Amino acid sequence: MKLILGSGSPRRVEILAVLGLTPDDIRPPDIDEDPLPSELPRPYVDRIIRAKAEAVPSDPGDVVLCADTTVAVGRRILGKPADEAEARAFLTLLGGRRHRVLTGLAVKTDDRLMTRIVESRVKMKRLSKVEMDGYMATGDWQGKAGGYAIHGPAGAFFPWISGSHSAIVGLPMVETAHLLQAAGIEVWKT
C-alpha cells in the first residue's frame, strides 16, 4: 500500500511529516480550478477535491490524498491572484474583516472516496501602504489562495483565528489522520 500525495504543496508534505508520514510519491493533479458561474465556496471546494482525487493516477492498493484550500469572503471565492494588482485588491478587500478559509481533503482507495471540509475563520488587519508594499515585495502572495499564506510573512497580519491552524496552512491534521487511518494507513507507525 502506497500513500500518494496529490499536491505539490511543500506545506502539505511538512504536515504529513508531523503525523509521522512520508508520501511514497507526489503527483500534483492537473485540473481546471476555476469556479463555475455563481458557485458557492463549500460546493466549489467539494467539487475540486473530488476532481483532484480522480485526476491523480494510482495503482491498485494505493491511497491517494488530495486537498484544496480556498479563501472566501461571503459568497465570493478568492483564488490565487493572477498578478500583483489582483493580490493587492484581495488584501485590501480582506483588510479589517473576518473571512473564511475552507480546506477540503479527499482520500481515495480502490473502492472508496472519503472527503471532509474544514472551515476556519480568520481576521486580517487593515494593511498600511508600507505593509502592503513590503508584503508585495516578498512575492509570498504568488500562488496562494486569497494572496497570502498565514504561515509566512503574512502571518503578522492576522490578530485572530478560529478553527484549525493546520487547515489554514493547507491540511487539517485531525481530519487527515482520521481519513488516512480509515483507508488503512497507519499514522505514527514506527
Swiss-Prot record:
<dbReference type="GO" id="GO:0009117">
    <property type="term" value="P:nucleotide metabolic process"/>
</dbReference>
<dbReference type="Pfam" id="PF02545">
    <property type="entry name" value="Maf"/>
</dbReference>
<keyword id="KW-0378">Hydrolase</keyword>
<dbReference type="InterPro" id="IPR003697">
    <property type="entry name" value="Maf-like"/>
</dbReference>
<dbReference type="InterPro" id="IPR029001">
    <property type="entry name" value="ITPase-like_fam"/>
</dbReference>
<comment type="function">
    <text>Nucleoside triphosphate pyrophosphatase. May have a dual role in cell division arrest and in preventing the incorporation of modified nucleotides into cellular nucleic acids.</text>
</comment>
<dbReference type="GO" id="GO:0047429">
    <property type="term" value="F:nucleoside triphosphate diphosphatase activity"/>
</dbReference>
<protein>
    <recommendedName>
        <fullName>Nucleoside triphosphate pyrophosphatase 2</fullName>
        <ecNumber>3.6.1.9</ecNumber>
    </recommendedName>
</protein>
<feature type="active site" description="Proton acceptor">
    <location>
        <position position="68"/>
    </location>
</feature>
<comment type="similarity">
    <text>Belongs to the Maf family.</text>
</comment>
<keyword id="KW-0963">Cytoplasm</keyword>
<dbReference type="GO" id="GO:0005737">
    <property type="term" value="C:cytoplasm"/>
</dbReference>
<keyword id="KW-0546">Nucleotide metabolism</keyword>
